């Protein structure tokens, strides 16, 4: 049975992501962060920020991301920003990463797998050849993973096993969220996979 994870709680043993942290940056107030795992990825979730680590410096805008090395990282923003850092152990072939939005609409379209529950959003039921992690930044939603319904609020992270059919059928408060797809495995197909097109979904972990 899956559980939602908050920032200070451990993720499942099978998870590629071992920890995550959200950072709200005030203007001209640098923040130092210690990266402790072998792999890390920073994603800008609002505004613009400068990331400095060792001799590297990179400016990111909302939706852009970069890898981090173990060690100290300095984050700074001229006008305020937010970023999330995922840490863990994953391979070199990854799926997607970014920000998505969802809200309830009058006539939702659905090209994904058929479902038995009511659909109110345009998010389709699908699976991946990798693990995926959803982190809710704004709004409220119900997500479904392998038939299990989970109510999400800001700060909740949902670890989704490889091959698990998942969906966000209800977003009564418009949602802004992060998605991070980790190591591609098996057939290493990218994007949304549907059983009616790509074959049966086989959940690999978290049963």
Q: What are these regions, as identified by a protein language model?
A:
Residues 1-16, 30-33, 37-50, 56-59, ...:
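Generic N-terminal amphipathic/basic segments
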Residues 3-5, 78-115, 171-207:
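Double-stranded beta-helix
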Residues 23, 33, 42, 58-59, ...:
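Residue "hotspots" at secondary-structure boundaries inside conserved domains
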Residues 48, 72, 140-142, 149, ...:
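Structural motif
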